[in-house]
Amino acid sequence: MKILKAGFNRQKRVWKQGQKNWQKVSADCRKVENMAEKKLVALTFDDGPSVGTTDKVLDVLKENDIVASFFLIGQKITEESAYLVKRAHDMGCTIENHSKTHPGMTGLTDEEILEEISYTTNKIEEITGEKPAFFRPPYIDYDQRLFDLVDLGFICGYGCEDWLPEVSAEERTRRILEQAHPGFIILVHDMEGNTQTVEAIKKIIPALKGQGYEFVTIRDLFAKSGKVPERNTLYMEV
């Protein structure tokens, strides 16, 4: 299990794509032996629900008979997109929290942080009947105050810079497969127009299944590994 903990010195690099910022945290990590007996992997998607992308992602999941976890932006859960949330949940996917407006969370007041979380939690519960169990901070921007305020498990993951249009589907596939190991969390995006990630997962999923991996939700990744999410911890793997 690899975990990132608040309190380490971090260097942050920021990329900008149009109006979309991404903040990548380079942090000290400590590695703990992975105790999972099976080769488990959790495929996770950020920045949905997106009509035109999330539905294609769900088609790929159905074709491959697997589940995933979706970290949703609350303000994107609308009358037009709510059916995607219900469809994902009905397929056995878990629906998690990715804030209301996708801000840098550490720059907010306590009240603003709680509104970002509660708004999205309520929108998800209205559709699925279940509250999120996990939170992924936008831009992986977090600190101890966020840990103290947000009573959810914190999730990061292994990505492939799939928010950058110049990173091809083939390169996204290669990067994810090179990082594969038991218990790892894949972090990709189902934002509007991200068709290259849709194409990438068409290759990633069968490749990992061919290596003996079982795709599970983020919740089952913990449960099947016999782990309980700890406070003050940001997980990249379990």
Where does each model-flagged region fall?
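CE4/NodB-like, metal-dependent polysaccharide N-deacetylase domain
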Residues: 58-67, 71, 94, 100, ...
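Short low-complexity, flexible loop/linker segments enriched in glycine and/or proline
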Residues: 73, 84-86, 111-113, 170-171, ...
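Alpha-helical scaffolding segments of alpha/beta enzyme cores, especially the outer helices
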Residues: 56-59, 83-90, 115, 119-122, ...
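Catalytic grooves of carbohydrate-active enzymes
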Residues: 180-219
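His/Asp/Glu-enriched short active-site or ligand-binding loop at hydrolase and phosphoryl-transfer sites
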Residues: 131, 141-179, 213-225
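Acidic-and-aromatic substrate-binding clefts and catalytic sites of carbohydrate-active enzymes
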Residues: 48-52, 72-80, 103-108, 136-142, ...
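Short, well-structured secondary-structure segments
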Residues: 42-43, 58-78, 87-89, 93-98, ...
